[in-house]
Amino acid sequence: MKSEIQIVKEEIDKIEQIVEALRQVKEYVWNSVNTEINIITEIFMRLIEKAQIIIDEGGEFPIDIVLQQIKNFNEALNMKDEILMADTLQYEIVNTMYVYLELLEEK
């Protein structure tokens, strides 16, 4: 069974491949995006749960930024905008997954 850290690292690799395909406007790219939606959503849900624990324990976490990134991802998906999706994945989703990795590795 894969660890949460391994799952997130593998997803980051997949997203980076999708970003490259989006920038090259490959035919199959939206199928790849659709395939990864559930995994991205699951990772972000676990991140939000972890963030809530941090907040409940008196810590700080920019959960509003994470929620905005999810909204941006959904907007790009609904618009089928390759540039917006590539930017959202590369500069928002992947960066947030790296933050989540740091949280997981602190355990």
Locate each region found by the language model.
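C-terminal-biased regions
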Residues: 1-107
